[in-house]
Swiss-Prot record:
Residues 90-99 have a biased composition (Pro residues). The keyword Glycoprotein applies. Residues 115-245 form the C1q domain. The modification 4-hydroxyproline is found at P36, P39, P42, P45, P54, P63, P81, P93, P96, P99, P105. Disulfide bonds join C179-C193. This is Complement C1q subcomponent subunit C. Core component of the complement C1 complex, a multiprotein complex that initiates the classical pathway of the complement system, a cascade of proteins that leads to phagocytosis and breakdown of pathogens and signaling that strengthens the adaptive immune system.
Length: 245
């Protein structure tokens, strides 16, 4: 009998069935087990079963040991520009810029009060037939102008109220020798003398002084004191502020 390769599975299956039937028959007749048959060939794999139910959650694993830090990577491409940040603190002042061109003239301002604030002027005369006493202060008793009241006729002294540069001048009539001395706060500044004998003559002098507030100026005579003040022969003392400080 010629057996090909394709009939081997069928032949093996038949032999297996024959071996299974032989013991059953021998047991029924004699009561003894037969010799076990040879194991059959493995069957074909069965179909996959259904998925089982999820198992319980496992225990946390052991933390892994940190690995060694790798080398620095290559520089990446520049990113997109970010949003503008908040304003920082003010920086230090910069260097002065180049002066700009001159602007057009502005409107005239209001008239100032310079003249009202800084004025000092007086003119007084000596109207008496009696000359001053020797080596004494000369009092001028008649006021021609004294709007600020800086000259006091009771004391014969000018008192500075506005600091600045002043000019003082006098014209004295006399018929005998006369020397006029100008004092500043007790210190003699200048002396003017005129000499005559029984004739009317005029002695004049002037001086510029820079005064501070509270300083005083007056005229005096020495041993030559023949100053008169009569109609037609006046003696005048004047002073005024030129430039305030």
């Amino acid at each position: 009998m010629d057996v090909g390769p394709s009939s081997l599975p069928h032949l093996g299956l038949k032999l297996l069935l024959l071996l299974l039937l032989l013991p059953l028959r021998g047991q029924a007749n004699t009561g003894c087990y037969g010799i076990p048959g040879m194991p059959g060939l493995p069957g074909a794999p069965g179909k996959d079963g259904y998925d089982g139910l999820p198992g319980p959650k496992g225990e946390p694993g052991i933390p892994a040991i940190p690995g060694i830090r790798g080398p620095k990577g290559q520089k990446g491409e520049p990113g997109l520009p970010g949003h503008p940040g908040k304003n920082g603190p003010m920086g230090p002042p910069g260097m002065p810029g180049v002066p700009g061109p001159m602007g057009i003239p502005g409107e005239p301002g209001e008239e100032g009060r310079y003249k009202q604030k800084f004025q000092s002027v007086f003119t007084v005369t000596r109207q008496t037939h009696q000359p001053p006493a020797p080596n004494s202060l000369i009092r001028f008793n008649a006021v021609l102008t004294n709007p600020q009241g800086d000259y006091d006729t009771s004391t014969g002294k000018f008192t500075c109220k506005v600091p600045g540069l002043y000019y003082f001048v006098y014209h004295a009539s006399h018929t005998a020798n006369l020397c006029v001395l100008l004092y500043r706060s007790g210190v003699k500044v200048v002396t003017f003398c005129g000499h005559t004998s029984k004739t009317n003559q005029v002695n004049s002098g002037g001086v510029l002084l820079r005064l501070q507030v509270g300083e005083e100026v007056w005229l005096a005579v020495n041993d030559y004191y023949d100053m008169v003040g009569i109609q037609g022969s006046d003696s005048v003392f004047s002073g005024f502020l030129l430039f305030p400080d």
